[in-house]
Regions:
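Bacterial carbohydrate/catabolite-sensing allosteric modules
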Residues: 1-22, 29-271, 275-277, 282, ...
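Terminal helix-turn-helix DNA-binding modules in bacterial transcription factors
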Residues: 291-316
C-alpha cells in the first residue's frame, strides 16, 4: 500500500502472497486491512497510529536529526526555521529531536505558520503566504527585504523541501544565501526535478526495506514474533548539495575565508595562507572568526580535512 494513492484496497483484495511490507497512510486501507487481512503477516514501515498490532521497521529519527542539526550548525546557523509537524508521528519525532539537539547547541527553533496539513496529515503543503511571513521576519530584524535574511529551513522530507525551494524561486528569494533548505530522504527523483540541488539526509531506504524483509521472514517463521515491536534503521549520512552551500556569518571576511578554506583545505594550507589570500593580518583574521564564527581558521581547516577523510573511509 502506498501513501501516494487514494487507497490500496484493490491491491489487498487481490493479494495472495505470504506476507506484506506496507506503509499505512490511508484510513480506508487501514479499515479494510483490520477487517479482512488482519491475519496476513505484515511489517509496517511507518508510524501511523492505526491501532493494529504490527511489527514496524522505521527510520531512526533521532540519528536523522543529529545529522541534520550538526550540518546546519556547522554552516554557522544558530537558529532553524520549520513548520508545525501537525499530527504526523514521523514529523513529530523529527521536530522533537530538532528541538532537543538545537537546545544542546544553544540554538533556537522557530515555527513558520503558513503551511497546510492534509486531512490524513501525511503531506504538509508549503503556502505562498510563507513568503509574506519571511518578509515580516526581515522587517522585524530591520532588514530591507527577504534577500537580506540569512536563515536555514528544515523540511521533514524532500517533497516539502522541494515545495519550499519552488516557492522561494517563484519570489526570487536567493537559495542558499538568504534561505538555506535541508530535506530528509535523499530522494533522487525529487532532487533531479529541482534546478537547485537539495541537501538531504540519506535515510538508506533500500537498507530499511531489506531490514523490513528480514523482520517479515521472522514473523513468517514464527507468528509469535509479531508482538508490535519497533525496529529502528539508522540513516546512512547527510548529503550536502547546493541548497545549503553557504555560511551564515555577518562578515564578508569570514565568509570569503570559509569558502577559500573549503576549496583549498586539501592542499596543505595553514591559517596564515588564508590571511595572505585575503590580504589581511593573521590577527585580523583570528579576530573576525572569533566574533562571527564557531571555530578558528586553523580549527576549520582541520575540521574540513577530518570530514574529507571520514567520507573517503566510508567509500572504501
Amino acid at each position: 500500500p502506498s501513501k501516494t494513492t487514494a487507497d490500496s484496497i484493490e491491491i489487498l483484495e487481490s493479494w495472495d502472497g505470504d506476507g506484506c511490507i506496507a506503509l499505512f497512510a490511508n484510513q480506508n486501507t487501514i479499515s479494510y486491512f483490520s477487517k479482512e487481512k488482519i491475519n496476513l503477516p505484515t511489517i509496517d514501515i511507518g508510524l501511523s497510529d492505526h491501532g493494529i498490532s504490527l511489527n514496524r521497521v522505521v527510520t531512526d529519527n533521532k540519528e536523522v536529526m543529529r545529522l541534520a542539526v550538526n550540518h546546519i550548525v556547522d554552516q554557522g546557523y544558530k537558529e532553524i526555521f520549520t513548520v508545525s509537524p501537525g499530527d504526523n508521528k514521523m514529523c513529530v519525532e523529527r521536530f522533537t529531536y530538532l528541538q532537543e539537539f538545537m537546545k544542546q547547541k544553544k540554538g533556537k527553533v522557530h515555527i513558520l505558520k503558513n503551511a497546510q496539513h492534509s486531512p490524513s496529515n501525511f503531506h504538509i503543503q508549503i503556502s505562498d503566504n510563507i513568503i509574506k511571513e519571511l518578509e515580516e521576519i526581515a522587517i522585524a530584524r530591520n532588514l530591507i527585504d527577504v534577500n537580506q535574511l540569512s536563515i536555514a529551513f528544515f523540511a521533514y522530507d524532500d517533497v516539502m523541501a522541494a515545495q519550499m525551494i519552488r516557492t522561494l524561486r517563484q519570489y526570487d528569494v536567493r537559495i542558499p544565501e538568504s534561505v538555506a533548505v535541508l530535506g530528509v530522504d535523499n530522494d533522487e527523483l525529487v532532487n533531479c526535478a529541482l534546478n537547485i540541488e537539495l541537501s538531504s539526509v540519506d535515510c538508506d531506504l533500500e537498507g530499511l526495506g531489506e531490514k523490513a524483509a528480514l523482520e517479515l521472514k521472522k514473523v513468517l517463521d514464527d507468528p509469535k514474533y509479531a508482538d508490535g515491536k519497533i525496529v529502528r534503521h539508522k540513516p546512512r549520512k547527510l548529503v550536502p548539495r547546493r541548497s545549503t552551500d553557504t555560511y551564515a556569518v555577518n562578515s564578508t571576511i569570514v565568509s570569503s575565508a570559509l569558502r577559500w578554506i573549503n576549496e583549498n583545505f586539501q592542499t596543505g594550507i595553514l591559517a596564515s595562507d588564508v590571511a595572505e589570500h585575503l590580504n589581511i593580518t593573521q590577527q585580523g583574521l583570528q579576530k573576525a572568526f572569533q566574533d562571527h564564527y564557531i571555530r578558528t581558521p586553523g580549527q576549520e581547516i582541520r575540521y574540513q580535512r577530518t570530514i574529507a577523510v571520514a567520507n573517503l573511509l566510508e567509500c572504501t
